[in-house]
Amino acid sequence: MAPLRALLSYLLPLHCALCAAAGSRTPELHLSGKLSDYGVTVPCSTDFRGRFLSHVVSGPAAASAGSMVVDTPPTLPRHSSHLRVARSPLHPGGTLWPGRVGRHSLYFNVTVFGKELHLRLRPNRRLVVPGSSVEWQEDFRELFRQPLRQECVYTGGVTGMPGAAVAISNCDGLAGLIRTDSTDFFIEPLERGQQEKEASGRTHVVYRREAVQQEWAEPDGDLHNEAFGLGDLPNLLGLVGDQLGDTERKRRHAKPGSYSIEVLLVVDDSVVRFHGKEHVQNYVLTLMNIVDEIYHDESLGVHINIALVRLIMVGYRQSLSLIERGNPSRSLEQVCRWAHSQQRQDPSHAEHHDHVVFLTRQDFGPSGYAPVTGMCHPLRSCALNHEDGFSSAFVIAHETGHVLGMEHDGQGNGCADETSLGSVMAPLVQAAFHRFHWSRCSKLELSRYLPSYDCLLDDPFDPAWPQPPELPGINYSMDEQCRFDFGSGYQTCLAFRTFEPCKQLWCSHPDNPYFCKTKKGPPLDGTECAPGKWCFKGHCIWKSPEQTYGQDGGWSSWTKFGSCSRSCGGGVRSRSRSCNNPSPAYGGRLCLGPMFEYQVCNSEECPGTYEDFRAQQCAKRNSYYVHQNAKHSWVPYEPDDDAQKCELICQSADTGDVVFMNQVVHDGTRCSYRDPYSVCARGECVPVGCDKEVGSMKADDKCGVCGGDNSHCRTVKGTLGKASKQAGALKLVQIPAGARHIQIEALEKSPHRIVVKNQVTGSFILNPKGKEATSRTFTAMGLEWEDAVEDAKESLKTSGPLPEAIAILALPPTEGGPRSSLAYKYVIHEDLLPLIGSNNVLLEEMDTYEWALKSWAPCSKACGGGIQFTKYGCRRRRDHHMVQRHLCDHKKRPKPIRRRCNQHPCSQPVWVTEEWGACSRSCGKLGVQTRGIQCLLPLSNGTHKVMPAKACAGDRPEARRPCLRVPCPAQWRLGAWSQCSATCGEGIQQRQVVCRTNANSLGHCEGDRPDTVQVCSLPACGGNHQNSTVRADVWELGTPEGQWVPQSEPLHPINKISSTEPCTGDRSVFCQMEVLDRYCSIPGYHRLCCVSCIKKASGPNPGPDPGPTSLPPFSTPGSPLPGPQDPADAAEPPGKPTGSEDHQHGRATQLPGALDTSSPGTQHPFAPETPIPGASWSISPTTPGGLPWGWTQTPTPVPEDKGQPGEDLRHPGTSLPAASPVT
C-alpha cells in the first residue's frame, strides 16, 4: 500500500475533453482546458434567508424550446445539415416544485473557493426585446425562425456585499459572472444537458477571471476610422447617407439619461458546432447578459442597456464566406456589408438594430475588431469578436466601447495608470486583473459622443413580461463524474474499499485499475453510494422522499455555573450550552448566539499587600523560563493589538525583550491596565462594567464612583521645592491610595530624577538607582505609567486608581545639589482625603452642569422656506466644556426653539446647451454637427449642480443636426500622355481628361477643360517619305447611363508610303466612309485612300468605287461616328485637334466602364456587352455590336517591306493607341 499511497499523493490536474461536434453522445464539458486555477461547487436553491430548499438550480426553459415557426423555402432540399426542432418534454413527474410558481426572484447558495455566497437574483427583463426572433441561415437563406426567449436570464447581487454584482442564467445549471467585492468569478456546469439528473446536486466549475490563460484584444486589433477599409464604398456610403440624414426613426423614447443599444447578435457555425445546437442559444444569452452587466457598472457614469432584438445562427458555408482567416480587415468589411443587408428597413420594426455583434471561433486575427465612433452608422456600427468562453463578454464590451467612441486607455490619453487595475478599454484586455471597471477616460470619451447617438434613445421594451420559470430536477452517477473529471473511460476506483465513499471521489482507468486519482472533493450530493443510499454533504445517507433538508441547529438548556477561577481579587465562572437540540444537518445553519455565559465572582480584594495577577503569572517564569540562554526577571507587557489582550506576553526587566509565552492568561485576569473591570475568560476579553456585571455599560466618574456625577470628587494639587542637604533621595509628597488621574512634573530643568516608592511594601517602582530617565511606558502596581522626558524636564502620569499609597521623591545627582521643584495633581473621593498640608490646595470638584445651545439642526428644506430647531448639549459651568448629556438633569432641558430658514426661492433646473461643434464634413450628404446638453440646477453660490435629465422641464434640446450638405465640388483629373502617333516627323499625343468629385462620381467642373491632344515632333523622316501626321478627332463612347459623350482618340501610326508610288486604289474599307474624308489633307491618309480623296477633291462623290476591296459603308442611324459638323472641319490644318462644341467647353468624359443594360432603348448598336478597360476593341462588318475603333495598348506592327498598313482582310479596320487611364 505504501507505493500506492505515494502514487496517489501526486495527483494529475483536471483534464477536460471538449466535444466540438454537435449531437455527439460524448458528454460536453465546457471547460476550456486553459484554467490555471479553479474550484468545484454544488450550488443549491434557497429561500430569501439562505435556507436550503433544493439542489434544482435549472429553470424549465432549457427543457422546452417553446413554439417554433418553421419558414423553409419550398425549393430548398432537405439534407442532414438541417436543424432539428426541439420538442417540449413534460416536466418530470408532472409536478411543480413548491414555492416556484409566480416567483419573481431566485436565491442560490454557491461556495466559491471556500466562501459561501448567497446570491439574490431577479429576472433581467430588459435583455431580450419583445417580438425578437432567432433565425437559422444557410447559403444566405433563412431555414427557419422561432421567437427568441429569455426565460432564465437573471441579474442581482450577493447578500452582505454592497458592491457585488451577478449576471447568471439558469437555463442549464448556473452559468455566468459573479462579481464580489474583491474579484470576479465565472461559474458554469461541469457538463451540459443534465437537468434531469439535477435533483440531488450538480457539479459546477468556478474560476477567477485571471485563471483564464489567454490574451484578448491586441493593441492593433481595433479598427479606427482612418483604417476602416471597406473597399470602394464611397458610393454606397452616399446612398446610406441619404437614409441616415433623411430618415428619422419613430420609436418609443427611453427615459432621460437612459440609453439602449439594440443589438443584432450573429453567431457563426464554428460557435454553434463548439457549444452544440441545443445549447448555443442559452450560452450566447448568458454571454450578452454579462455584457449588459458590464455596461451597468457605476464607473461608466451612464445607464446603458444591451437589448437583443434579433439572433442569427449562420451556417457552415456562409460562415466561411464571411470570415477570411488571418485577415481581420477583410473579415470585418464582409461582416458589416452582410449585416447591413439584414437590417429591417422599417425603423419602427421590433428587429431594427442599432449595432451588430458577430461571434466566431474562426481565426481571423486578434480577439476583436471594430471601427471607432461607428455607433448608429448603417455600415460602421458592427464589431467582430472571437468567442472563447465567458471571458469573451469583456471582448464584446471592449469592442462595443470602441464603436461608442472610446479609445484605448493610455494611448493618447492620461489613463495608463488604470490599465493594470483592470480597465475594460486597456490595450491588452487581459484576464490578469481581479475586477473590471471603466476608466475615467472611457467615461469622458463616452460622454463626448453619446449625445450624438440618437438611435440609442429608443426604448424597445413593453411593460408586460413573462413570469420566471419553474425548476426541474437532475442527478449523476459516480462513473459519470469520474469521466467528467478525468476523461473518457474513467470509472469509480475499486482497488481499495472505504467506509466513507462520499468523502472523496476516487477514479481509475480500466487499463490501470490500481492507479486511482482524486480531486480531493466529494461526489455530488445525490450520487448513489450504496443500495438505497446517496451522498449528501459528504455522508452516505438513506434515500427518502420526505428527507428533511436544511435542518438548522438548536441550543440545549444552560448548564449550572461552574466554580470561580479565583478565590479573591475578581474571578469569573461560566456555564455552557450545546448546539444539539437538534444538531445542524443537511446544510442547515449553526446555532446563533454564545455558547458560554460568564459571571464575575469573588470580586473582593485579596488580603495583604496588593499583587498584580498578570504580573504574578509572568514572575512564575523567572525560575525556569530561559530566553537566549539566560533566565530573566519577567514583568507584564500590554500589546497595542486588542486581539492579544488575553495572551500572556512578558517583558524582561533586564534586557527589555518582549516574549510571547504562547498561552492565554488565567481566567479572571484583567484584559487591560487601562480597563479596571473587564476580564479574560477562555482567551477572550469579556466586557464588564463598574457594577461588576458582564456586558454592563456603567462607568466610574473621575473619582471612582460607579455611575457618579463627580459631585464627590476633589482635586488636590500643589507645588514643592526643597534643597537636598544630604546624599540620597529627598521625599517631596505622599499620594494616598484611591487617588486617580495623577500628574507629576518638574517645573524647571533640573538634574534631579523623580523616584516613586510604594509606601506599603517599600519597593521602588521608578528609578530606584536614579538612572538617567528616558521616555517610556511601564506597568507597576497594576497600573500603566507614562514617564516622559522633554527638554530636560521629567513628568509622570497614570490614570489610577492607586491600590496603595506612594511617595514621590527627588534624587539629586550629588550631595547638596540644587533645589528641586515639582508640581503634582490628583483626583480623589472626598471620603479618602488626607490631611491637607500648607503646600496643598484643595479644589472644589462640585462641578455643576447646565444645558447650553449647541447648534441649530439642519434646515428642513434647501430653499423655498424651511424650519430648523435648536440642538442642546450638556456643558460644565466651570470651564464651559461640553460633556456627556447624561450628566445634566433631563428634567431641566429647555424646549427647542424654532425658526424659519432658507427663505430664498428655489431655482429650477434648466437645459444648458453648449456651442455647436464643427461640421463633420465640408460637403456631401453626411455632414452633422453636435453639441453637449446638460440639465443644470443653479446654486446660490453661483455654481451649478448636474441633475438627471428628468428633472428639467420640456423636451431635451436638439443635440445633433445636419450641416454643410451641399454637393462637393468636382475637379479635372488628367491622365498620362500617350506615345507619339508618328515614328518620325510630326504626330500627336493624347490623354484622358475627366471631371470627378472626391467620391469618384461625375460632377460639374469649373473652368475650361484641359487639352486632351497635343502635337509631338520627332526627327524628320529620311528618303522620299513624307512626314506622316495624324490629327485626333472626337469620337463618342457610351456611358453607363446610356448617354453619349465625346471621346478623343488618336489614330494608329501609319507607315510611310513613297509619294512616287502610283495610286492603284483604296487600301481600306474605311476609305468609303464620308466621315473620314476630313483626313485626306494628311499625306499618310491620302496615300491609304488615294482614290476616295481624289474623288472628294474633284467634286461630290456619287457612291463608292466598286473596287475588289471595297465594301459598302455600314453607317447606321445613331452611329457613334458622326461626320464633320461643317466643311470647315475638313479644311482644318493638319495636326490641330478638333472636337465638338461640348468637348471644347470642357464637358466631362466618362471612362470606359460597365454599360447599363437595364435600358435597351439607350444601348448603342456598336456598344459591347461586356467591355473590359485596356482590352482591344475591333469592328467587323459581319459582326454586329462592334465599335469602329479599338482600344489597345500595343498597335499591330506592319512589316517595313510592305507599303501598306497591317490589316486583317477578314476583319478590316484601323486600330488606335489607347491613352493611359485616369487615376
UniProtKB/Swiss-Prot annotation:
Task: Give start-end positions of Basic and acidic residues composition bias.
Answer: 1199-1211
Where found? Secreted, Extracellular space, Extracellular matrix
What PROSITE patterns does the entry give?
A: ADAM_MEPRO, PLAC, TSP1
How would you summarize where this protein is expressed among tissues? Expressed in retina and at low levels in brain, lung and placenta. High expression in fetal tissues.
Q: Which Cys pairs does UniProt list as disulfide-bonded?
A: C336-C382, C376-C455, C415-C441, C482-C507, C493-C516, C502-C535, C529-C540, C564-C601, C568-C606, C579-C591, C980-C1016, C984-C1021, C995-C1005
Write out the catalytic residues in the record: E399
- Its job: Has aminoprocollagen type I processing activity in the absence of ADAMTS2. Seems to be synthesized as a latent enzyme that requires activation to display aminoprocollagen peptidase activity. Cleaves lysyl oxidase LOX at a site downstream of its propeptide cleavage site to produce a short LOX form.
What is the name of this protein?
A disintegrin and metalloproteinase with thrombospondin motifs 14
Q: Which organism is it from?
A: Homo sapiens
The gene behind this protein is: ADAMTS14
